[in-house]
Amino acid sequence: DEKLPVELQGKTAINLSRQAYLDYQKIFNGERFAALKAHGAKGQYLLWASTGVKNKNYSDVMYIEELIGEETINTVPDATLDAFRDHGVAASRLTNGIQNASVILAQVEANGINLHELGEKLQKDGLQQFVEAFDKLLDLVK
């Protein structure tokens, strides 16, 4: 975020999520899935995993509030859940400004951020964190 102009800071993850939600809607609200649904197929939900805020300059409920939307699930750290219970607002915001998501992401890339590389790194790091958490859980039950 530090590489970005102030007006773009804190917007990358939210707009990547909005773009993912648009892609999700195209798949599960499209003709191809409608045919499957007619035969009993159930849609999936999008999972936003561990959406705690690490930057102290942002609201501690920024991600949980911005990612509330239909057919989504959000897992959050305990501290984020406590903060949301205390002062969060439960309202669907995921689709707010969703049509501008691609524009904002293009601006992010124009400022030197390679979103594909960033996504690969975040997926790798996130997967490693889940592996470590799972291993700790297994150690507890051994």
Where are these regions (language model features)?
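Active-site or pore-adjacent capping/gating segments
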Residues: 89-142
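A C-terminal functional module that forms or caps the active site or interfaces directly
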Residues: 58-109
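Catalytic alpha/beta core domains of metabolic enzymes, predominantly
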Residues: 1-79
